[in-house]
Amino acid sequence: MGADCKSVAKATQVRILHLPPQVRAYFSRMPFGVDRSVVIRAEHLFGPDYARALVDRDLTTIEELVAVTPTKLRSEVRRAAGRIAELGGWIAQDSGDPVKAEQLTRRAEDHVRSADPALRAMVSMRRSNILLASDPRLAVELAADAAQLIEGRSVGRLAVSVARQRALAAIADRDRARFVAHAAHALDIAPTEPVADDHAVYANSAYVAAEVASGFIAINQPAKALDLLLGHHHGWPAGQRRDHAVASARLLRTFIVLGDYHAALDHMDVAVRGYLAAPSDRARRELRLCRRIIRDRARADQHFPLRTLRRRIEATLQGDTEP
């Protein structure tokens, strides 16, 4: 490694000394490894702004390293840069900034263009997820690209997450038949065990069930969504509090869609506690949907459960100006 590269690395080491111990391990692995779980823990501990700044600083450092790294090592550095950029995109998306998420994930695509198929598939899948609302047709194509990249390969739960993403892209593109087919496949392979260096270890059965449940609500099958959500409500690992909070808010929405307002009231405390303990844009969107449904129905129904639900959700979303 040349003198310029060493000076950048030394600057990184100096910066490590000033980091909280919970995230120091992340930088100690640079530039050739990215411990996603440590950054996610940092976000939980210090908030998304801290984690985003952490990733932005490190991405700048490693992109400087790319320019001065010998050719034979450059692919490893680019691979690490791609993983950092993808992680930054994930944090931006979960914080409600899809524009920044798209920018960072495109940078990740640039860095991993010659990487192994599994990593390229993961980045394509992530970009597909970011584009669900703004460009569902491209989201479908990117998810299909991801599936093609890993076809016939042993990639553990990444295959599960890609199948789930194909289902979400299909429903975003209003393709009911493809959604049902991809959702069935994702649920079928959801018990897959993770492999070493699995890019989607989070994609367990509870996660997949919660994700595809939103699609079943969209195609007017809320009873199916309810079965999926209740079947895994107590099966979440401790390390996925945020995903669990999203699922809990989605369960609240499902009760409301079904008109079971007493069940929704019974579940309200659980959903609110989960959201406040592990807030995310995903959970906030679920609560906004709950608010919208209740507002529409309250025009014709002023009974106690609806009034109480509306008051509780309005209080939880206090200050939120989105419709």
Identify the meaning behind each predicted range.
Residues M1-I16:
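N-terminal export leaders
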Residues P20-P323:
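Conserved binding/catalytic microenvironments
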